[in-house]
């Protein structure tokens, strides 16, 4: 092997691997376990995926899809590494205000929404076979459901309200044609 060839190999080995630079790992100082992976998925020098880890297991993944510095999507995982729920920021303020839950088969089953953007869920949307079937909502913030919606064929069929605060509907509007 010539000196020139050896020099080229040594210099080449000292160059950073651009693919490796896209993924950064952090380890817990006490346990030595992997605690975070940061990924530059778009290859533009800015991290856009943050994976919070317990060793080799995902706890949560946060994604800044539009790279504005605010997280847009949160994925939460069970200890068995199943996707538990997906959070999104509907107001694009970097705070989750809606969470989607799926069945074991991956079909959307429920969405919980904090309509006041305060982190407190007050609207529950239930899905059957991929379509909205019913909604329950706490409209006055007292922690009790006081509005119920039923949906049929992707259209609202009826809305019921608890205007007397008894915990049961006392007024219903039916939108179905009779």
Where are these predicted regions, by residue range?
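C-terminal motif of bacterial Sec signal peptides marking the signal peptidase cleavage site
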Residues: 10-12
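Calcium-binding motifs, dominated by EF-hand helix-loop-helix domains
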Residues: 37-41, 51, 59-65, 75, ...
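Bacterial signal peptide processing site
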Residues: 14-16
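A short glycine-rich beta-turn/N-cap micro-motif
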Residues: 31-34, 55-59, 80-85, 104-110, ...
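Bacterial N-terminal signal peptides that target proteins for export
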Residues: 1-2
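Post-signal peptide N-terminal segment of mature Sec-exported envelope proteins
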Residues: 19-43, 50-51, 60
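Aromatic-rich beta-strand edge motifs centered on tyrosine
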Residues: 25-29, 50-55, 74-79, 99-104, ...
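Acidic, glycine-anchored loop motifs typical of Ca2+
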Residues: 43-46, 67-71, 92-95, 117-120, ...
């Amino acid at each position: 092997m010539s000196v020139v060839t050896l020099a080229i190999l040594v210099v080449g080995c000292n160059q950073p691997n651009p693919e490796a630079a896209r993924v950064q790992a952090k380890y817990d100082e006490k346990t030595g376990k992997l605690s975070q992976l940061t990924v530059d998925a778009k290859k533009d020098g800015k991290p856009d995926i943050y994976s919070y880890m317990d060793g080799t297991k995902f706890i949560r993944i946060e994604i800044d899809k539009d790279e504005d510095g605010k997280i847009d999507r949160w994925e939460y995982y069970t200890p068995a590494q199943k996707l538990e729920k997906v959070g999104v920021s509907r107001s694009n303020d970097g705070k989750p205000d809606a969470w989607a839950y799926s069945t074991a088969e991956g079909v959307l089953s429920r969405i919980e929404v904090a309509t006041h953007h305060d982190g407190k869920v007050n609207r529950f949307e239930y899905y059957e076979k991929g379509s909205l079937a019913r909604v329950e909502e706490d409209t006055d913030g007292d922690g009790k459901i006081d509005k119920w919606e039923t949906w049929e064929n992707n259209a609202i069929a009826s809305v019921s309200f608890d205007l007397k605060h008894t915990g049961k509907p006392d007024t219903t509007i039916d939108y179905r044609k009779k």
